[in-house]
Amino acid sequence: LPAFGTGSNLDLKTERKAVSLGGEKWITPNLMFEATFKNEDKDGARIFGKGFTCPSGVAPTPICTALAAGANQWALLLLPEPINSTTRQFEAKLNYIGDKFAVTAGYYGSFYNNDNGSLNPMVVGNLNNPLGHPMGADGSVPLTAGLRNILQLPMALPPDNQAHQFYLSGNYAFTPTTRANFKLSYTHATQHDNFAGNGFTDGPAGVNDYGGVLNTTLAQIGLTSRPMPKLSLIANLRYEDRKDESPLALYNIEGANRFTNGTYSLKKTAGKLEGTYQLPANLRGTLGIDYEALDRGQLSSPECIDLGDGNCQGDSVAGISGLRAKTHETSYRAELRRAMSEMFSGAISYVHAERDGSSWLKPNALPATGVTPVSDEAIFNRTAIFPFIFMDRKRDKVKLSADWSPIDRLSLQFTGEDGKDKYSAPTTKGLRDTKMRLYGVDMSYALSEAWKLTAYYTYSEQTLHVSHSTGYIADLEDRNSTAGIGFSGKPMERIDVGADLLYISDRNIYAQTADQLASATNVAFLAQSGGLPDVTFRDLRLKLFGKYALQKNSDIRVDLVHDRQRLNEWTWGFNGVPFLYSDNTTVGLNPNQNVTFVGVRYIYRWQ
């Protein structure tokens, strides 16, 4: 086992080469054709890895050698993912624009090809245990054949796939004050990359590829109307049906238990209704209601394979205590806006939302698959684990805003927001609540008819309070300050120039405490270590552009971007000690990153 720091350096990087082409043509005064094509090649490598503990539920004895209680072996390897892929995107559409009716019909295609199908690691020699000592030293158990063999199993890389979408969208003006819009689309996505061609020869019998099929249908309709001079109405309805029609096969095994791959279908319905009325005293009031329903019906009635012996095997849910097939959320909004004078106006808004769902589904233990519907009382456990996307949630948010123009050339906007989410489930653990605050100011100043100056500043705080099932409480907080200043103008009739300077300061705080049921060892360790340090990020970015009009229908544009970033993140190392993998490989990230981008574009518009 070589000592860390004695090997060669490898700089992980990815190069992207992209070419895009687009054009448009007016066939008639009302009909236009548009087409775009983009080809992007990626080459290089990025950070990736593999880890395993042995024995475990998915690899019991005799696959993994049985060890004494609490003496499981585990290892973590750095395995850079080789990248050599091509993504092609093509879109073509017809646009018709009439006096009252406008419609667009189009096709969009995406084609992904990966020249690397699998990653095949090799473990040469010994590995370190979790304490950084060679396995087998100091009386510990040597590296077992079971763990070595599992670490050397091939790993699948992103497979070839493609998607085809046909869509139709448009709008129609019934009257000068009433307009409707709509969109219909159908997407057919497939994945048929061959297993054997990618180095996988021990798949299910008779199955040559995954045969993935995902069909998505989307329908949306909206209406805006002003039935009265003082009343405006908005209504929207959106429906999306995503059907995962991939075939099932017995891909997975835990000991002697077999189960299939999992498919995930989703139906999503969303609606919005809003009304705005002009009140006396320069007041304008808005009331709105939003509704969203998610139907994951396949979770409550999962597909399965009839094995011919009376058993029907499906996929297995593990690692969580329960899930839900359906959730629905209703939001209520109210806003009051007033123009105090020609120079100043302000608004206050409030949002309240509640989300709940169907009964909880408890995963069945192997060899059974699927889930069983149960009540909250039946599934309750003090340390139960429920994904937050299924948990009940109450949301309250208030927002203040103001617009002020003390002089014609100067405009200022002020914003302040405060919100809180509360989560609940049949457990005392998990995500409890989140909070957010945001304050911002934007400024725009016209130096002259040809020159404009802009500036802004935003400060935000986001917090998450999580009670972990293992006995600690995490109060996670992110503080972010963003400031920018820029200008744009025309020094000459044919020339446009501009510049923007952006500064970002971000700090993630990981405050940790032990709860009353934490072990004495964990309490002592937290007190000694002090918990996790903060993570900080700084970004200073300068953007410059210039555009020259060669002719009425052609331009040339030059962009220059210089970006300087600094990241202080303990994941990559702490106090000068880099992160160490089980084979003594170290990984590091240069905390100071400087990037310069230069782009030149030629723009031609067909008349």
Q: What are these language model-derived features?
A:
Residues N39-D43, G98-A102, G109-N113, Y186-T190, ...:
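Transmembrane beta-strands of outer-membrane beta-barrel pores
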Residues N30-F33, K100-A105, P176-F182, P229-A235, ...:
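Repeated loop/turn-to-beta-strand initiation elements of outer-membrane beta-barrel proteins
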Residues E15-V19, T86-F90, I97, D160-F166, ...:
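Residues that define the transmembrane beta-barrel architecture of outer-membrane proteins
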Residues K25, Y96-G98, Y172-F174, S225-R226, ...:
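Residue-level signature of outer-membrane beta-barrel architecture
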Residues S20, P80, E91-K93, A102, ...:
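Membrane-embedded beta-strand positions in outer-membrane beta-barrel channels/transporters
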Residues L1-F4, R46-L78, N116-A156, Q191-Y210, ...:
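Solvent-exposed loop segments that connect transmembrane elements
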Residues A3-D43, I47, I63, L77-Y112, ...:
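Transmembrane beta-barrel wall of Gram-negative outer-membrane proteins
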Residues N590-Q607:
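Outer-membrane beta-barrel "beta-signal"
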